[in-house]
Amino acid sequence: MELVDESVHNGLHDATKFKMDFVTLPSTVAPTQPVVLRFTPKNAADNTSLKNLKIVHEMPMHLLMVSHDLSWFAHEHPEAKPDGSYELAFRFPKADKYHLYADITPADASHNQVFKLEKTVGQASSVEPNLTPNVRFSGDGYEYELRSEPTALTAGKSATLTIVISKGRKGVTNIENYLGALGHMVIISEDREDFLHAHPEDHAHTTAEMKDPSHSHSGSGSHGAMSHEGKANGPNVSFMTLFPKSGKYKVWAQFNIDGKVRTAQFVVSVG
């Protein structure tokens, strides 16, 4: 596997070149019960397995999962198998329809490919998201504030989202790398069709890249670039991205603080 240092990738995959087979073992999944998620990336032309994926942020595959109502989120990394498949032993927390975004970068691809998949667990009610804009989050004694530049976010225009982290009213300055980055940000639109993923590096894209070569990261998967301000390890961490359309978006930001990966969540509105 080739090592690659990328901060952003395309959202939608190129269906003319790549496909993703997805099965669960067992096929019927019950909440809280063990299940194996198996992903097999393939060449679309001849249906052969893609066995040489690039390593991006220390992993060949990043799997982002959300519940249908966007109240639950997970960031996992399926393990490579000799036959070219990737497996993850998992337990879904509740009955629901889950949306899975499998993010890979084939060796012969110029950017990443994101595959949007779905799995219904138990008797899912499929409650729609009810998102209310919120730029503050508290958890485990830490306070997180999301600041945007510009303040009014606009579809199709670049924006910088800065997360300010504090504890006891003091800025946190001991943020450590997580998967080769100071932080990770995942952004998903209210309809779950647009997916953005940002990291602390110097270039950015979105799913709009698949629709518009100008690049950004969204639609059905993407990444945005991230830089950090002030001290290299906090308290401000800034992510640059581009929202592909107007509407509400759920934002998850992950940081490694005091040896633990902590996840903050927000909701932003884009005009």
Where are the model-predicted features located?
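Intrinsically disordered, low-complexity terminal tails/loops enriched in metal-binding residues
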Residues: 1-271
